[in-house]
Every structure is written in C-alpha cells, then in structure tokens.
Amino acid sequence: MLIFCALLGFSKSSIAQSMPFGDYNTSFITPLSAQLNRYDFYPVSKSTGTTNINIPLFSIPTPDDTQISFNLSYHSSGIKVEDPVGILGYGWSILPGLRITRMQFGKVDEHCKLLPLNYNTSIFPRSYWARPNTDEEAIWGYDGEHDIFFINTIDQNTSFIIEKNNNCFTAKQIKQTPLKIEVIGTAEGFKVTDDQGVVYIYGGNSDYTIETSACKQVYLLKEIIYTDSQKISFNYGREIIKTSTPTQSHKLVYTTSNDWEIISVNNPVVQGDCILKSITFPLGKVTYEYHSSRKEILKNIKIYGNNSQLIKTISFITDTNKNLLQSVTIPGSGKYSFEYNPTTFENVYAQDLYGYYTGKKNATYIDMIPQNTVLKALNKNIGNARSSVESAMQANILQKIVYPTGGYVSFEYEKNQAINPIDNSIVICGLRLKQMNIYTPENNQTVSKTYKYGNNESGYGKLVTLPSDWDYWIQRKRYDLSDMSYTGYIYEIISQSSLNILYRNSYLIWYDEVAEYTPAGKTVEKYNYQYNQGGSGFVSEFWQMLYHKPYIIDRKVYKGNNVQEHTEYEYYEDELSYIMGISVRSNLYYPSSEPDIPIHLNKICHDKEIAGIFSPTVNGNMISGDTDSNPDFTIDNYAIHTGLFRLGRKTTRLYDDEAVPYEISEEYLYSDNLLYNMTGTLSCTSLGDSIYTRYYYPSDGYPGYPQTICDLLSQRNLSTTVIATEQTKISGSKQSLISGKKVIYDSIPGDYTRMYPVKTYYKNKLQPDFRQENQRTYYPFGKLATETGRNGVST
C-alpha cells in the first residue's frame, strides 16, 4: 500500500563538514539527522510544492496494546549535490526518527552564562568572546543565543530550549504540547513523558549521543518505558556516512596586499553517525542488517517473535554506485520498484546558489563573489556558472514507483520560483511537483493530477527570507597576529549558503495559492504564512518554529467553472510570548579597526568567535551598530516566538448547483490552562440548529467526579485524558441534552503510573441522570480481567 498525503514535515540541514564549516557559529547536525530533519523544516504540503510518499514497512506491538509503525518515506523537494546519502540512498528515510537533535546558536548553552537583555551592548568584555580552550578565560563567557532542540516521540514532535536556574536545567517548549521534558544532568540526556504516562529516554551516555563542535548534537532514543515497567530498547552502531561527492570550497590566500592565489579544496564528506542495529520489545526483536562493503547501507530488516523464530524479512536493494534505492520487498505486500531521473552528479562544482545540480562542465564557485569588494579583480572569473538549470536540478530525483500490483505512480517536476521584492529578480530554489500520474491495472486507467502555483496561477511564490551572496563567505584566518598587513589572510567561498545552514536548508519559497486539476475538476487552496510580530520590539528569527509551515485559509472545489464546495479556515494564537535573546556578530573582515584599513572592507562575516582570535577593540572603545565608523560588532535583539497556533473555526458551504448554499460551521474551543486540550466543538448549520459537544479534563473537573482522581491524572501527566463528555442541541435560546458520558479512572496493582478506566456511566435525553453501564477489573500490570455490563453479565 502506498500512501500520498500532505503532512506536517521537516527540512534538513546542509551536511556536516569538517573543514570549511568548522568555525561557524551555527553547528551542523549529523548526516542521518539531516535526512530526518528534512521533514521538520521542509514541510510536506501543496504550499511548498511537495508530496509525501510513505510505504508501510512493519509494526511492533507495545505493552499498552498499541503499535509502533515504521514507514519508508521519500521527500520530493529535490536532491542537492552535497546531500547525505543516508542508509537507503538519496531522498529516503525510515520514520520515526528516534532522536533529539540540537541546533547550536552561538555557544553551547550548558557551558556559558546567559547574556542579560539589559546588558550594555556598547561595551562587551573579553569574556563574552572567550573560546573553550583559550588561555585567557577559564569559562566560555556569555552567550546571548539559545540552542534549539528538536524532539520526536512516536507520535508527537516539538522544539524546546534549555534554561539554567539554581544550577538546574529545565526545558521550555516553543510550541506547547502535553509532553513533559526533563533534562538529565548537564544536558547529558532527556527524559520525556507523554500524555499516556509512557517515558522516552534519550541519550544519557556516550553510546546514545553523538558529539560534534564540543557538545552533544544528537541524543538517540535509548528506551521506551511503559507504565507496567516493560521496555522497548534500541541499540545502535557507529558507522561512517558518506556521499558520492566531496564538498568543495575555494580559498583566496593573500601573500601580499596585491598578490593572491586561489586554492581549491576538496573536503570529503565523511562523518560518523549512529545507525540502528536492533530493537528489542517484550514479544520479540527487530534486527537491521547492512551491506558488507558499505556498512551504512541497509540491506535487510528482520522481525523475530518471542521464541526467536523469524517472522519476516524486508529486503532493500540499493545501487551503491549511484546511491539510489532500487526496490524494497515486503512479505505480505510484495515488491515496490523505484525509477529515477537518469542525470547524475558528474561535476561537484556544478551547483546553483542553493546546492542543486546545474550540469555545467567548467563551473566554479568564484562567480558568486560580490563585485563591490576588494576582490573585484576576480571578476575575470565571474560567469553564469551558478545559475539554476531546471532540467539538471532534477538529477537523481524519484520519477516512478511501481506497485506490487503492477500499477504505478509517476512524478513530473518543475522549478520553484519567486520574485525578489527588493530588485524584482527571479529566485529559483529547488523543485515542485508539476504532475502526478496514477495508473491502476484493474481498470487499465491512468488518472493525472496537475498543479498550478501562485496567485491566479502566476507560477511565482513568496520568499521566506531574502537570499544574499554574502551568505556564501565563511571566516578568514590569520596566521601571524602580530602582522597587520594583508599577509596571511584567507577568504573562503563555500558551496552552500549559510542561510541554508542556519535554517537547515529549510524551504526558501512557499505558495499562497495552489490549484490541483483532476478529470473531475479542480481544487484551489489558499495559504498564509505572514507573521505578525505584534509590536514586541524584537525580530523573531525563529517564528517558523511555532507556525511550522504555511497554513490553509481557503479551499474551493470546482465542477467545471462552478464552485461546488467552499471552506474557510480561521486560527487561534494563544499564550503568545517571546523567548528573548541577543545575537552578536563580528563585522570584521580584517582583524582590526585601524583607520588604514579601508572602510568598505568592513563587511558582516557571520562569525562571532573570530573576535576571540583577532582581539578587536574591547576595552571600552568599541563602536557598535554604526557601519560608517568601522564597528567591531552588530548586536540584534531577537525573539523565539512561542505559544500555540491552532484551528479555531471552519466554515463550509455546499452549493450542489443550488442558488442558496447549505452551510456548516464548526468552531473549536480550547482550555485556558492547557492550550492543547480541545474543550468543545460547536457545529452549526444554515437550517438553524446547533450541536455543542463539551469535553472535560482533569484540570477542569466535573460535577460529582472524584477530585482525588483528577489530581492523580494531572500528577501523572495524563492531562489530556477526557473524563466526561456532554452533547447538547441548541435551538434558538433552548438547549436540550442529547447524551453524556463519564469515565472513572483508577490505579491498579503493578502499574502506578498509568490510570485505567474502571467504571463508565451514560445519560441521554430520556435518562438525564448518569447510569452505570459497565465496570472493569484488571490483572496486575494492566491486562483486562473482566468487564461487567449493566445487566450484571461479566465477560
């Protein structure tokens, strides 16, 4: 079975590299995290021109009588030249991802002091710039920026920061969820409890963490502990993750002020990561087997029963030369085969400004040097080498999936494009889905879905952020600090933008309108993604952590030229607040503010710790914020936008060729205390009657409900448990009961974390008082023993 759906997804980071990116203030995640987090930061939606492709692989039973499902997933946003290959080839991942990933901003949060917001930003002490191993400081100094952590349990995800209070670390969520997140030690790991009392342990020791840039970047899921103390354990192995192409950079080395040479550097993308080796659960085990020659490429997944009997083997065939998954065979389902665009990456330099392949033979990175700099002598090398080529951008992209039934789905792509509002230039970044063709062998028919993008099908979207050539420069190094001449300066040009790095290659273009054409007609959806800062006075650099993706505001379904169905959406923003911070950047292209250094060389350099090497003016004489005075630093107040963003109302009008439409309106109400709890729905129709459904939670209480039970449910993080429901019909000013339900929960021997339903009561219009319908008893650790109905009969 193959499932296509528009889901809340993720974007990936530019791949981690040892050399040119080693001194960035923004850290890099590992290759597998990069692939997994693509779904976090490049949301799968029509508004981004993507479709999510999921193939169910297997499920394992859990002690709480549910299942954990694992899926093979492909992200259709395009393959960049420097993308990590992962364990199955370009574009493919196995979800869920089973890890927490840190995005480091500034310095590592657990090893430095938080810079106060009221700090005198015109004078910075040397301690702010202290580096981990400097001889001058015993500490790392201050840090004004928050590292952001991204977590995925089996069915929930969120992002959070850590804060230090009284030498203890606590987690603060950016988007509120029922998850309870606890920091283990000095961010050695995390304990996460979901709203059913299930505990997830991430990290904790070196076997379950991956360290880069002097801090823990990845925390692997170690175990899931259920309320009856049974566990599911995960075991990993460390392997080298590669790509078929090395990352490239140019170094412009000045030997004198007028003489320089270009050194091109190949940086093989070879980095360790942890790959899943086995999963042990109470009723069996899952093992992951990898190729002998490419130990990071997955070959088989084997599922065993509790008697070690092999139940089934899922086989993957990957072309290890092209790094493309060819097929997967799943017992009980059959074989899925995959076909790709035949264009491959022949020249690593052949990348556009966003890392997509251009196919050009003699391409270099030199052409993107800004022409208004001292390096204008390099203009002789500037060409059009990094402009995008639509056909080449499709290199290695998935084009067809053949089902076990003989049916197939094929994909056609086109370039993502938007108009830069600053200079009206056209920005091209990545691919969008143009057409999807679905063939069904049972009726020998092919159904096509075609997509048109932009307002009134203009073909152009909107930019999330403005691109800049300067984002492709990284730090300069000076070998002789006593020499104030040009000697020893090194400029580096990297292959991918630091904005791609900063936002983990998040999507640059989104569409406010998308039309889907099918043989039955068309559907037009409108989206919004304009963030209203609300007068906070801070630049909210991380608002997308809360809003996550463009959200639908309008949907029309057409039959011919006539609208058959029209739905409008309204949203709530609740408990909006800001996690404040201070972002500090060195403006130094040269390690000095000496007047003999030309002012025009003093460009922003996206690097803070360079100041700790070059010793800028810090003893009260520093100038900041005035580019005409050769400033050493630029200081920006910023905020991480937090709260909860949810659907508030949905109104649908059904025309059905009638002059007066039939209207259905649904309003969604939420708790004032726990914003993620929906307390009610109000459904209204144009006929006049309304249905109000009210949900009660432990924090709300309910007349006649034992308060001790409510307190226990809240204490055990079971705050989303519905204890009672009432449904009422509203006709004008009259209200009448339709039905009601009340469930009494209690603890049972052997399981003092979870609460179990022991009695259920019902009422309705004819029986307005609650009447017990059934009663349950349990064996120790939660297995149902008996259920007795209202008639006294037990099973």
Predicted regions span which residues?
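Glycine- and acidic-residue-rich phosphate-binding/metal-coordinating active-site segment common to enzymes
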Residues: 216-221, 225-300, 306
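Long, intrinsically disordered, low-complexity, charged/polar and glycine-rich segments
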Residues: 17-222, 226-229, 265-267, 348-392, ...
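Extended serine/threonine-enriched, polar tracts that run as long, contiguous segments within proteins
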Residues: 278-333, 660, 675
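Outer-membrane beta-barrel pore domains and translocons
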Residues: 73-75, 237-239, 416, 698
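Bacterial Sec-dependent N-terminal signal peptides
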Residues: 1-19
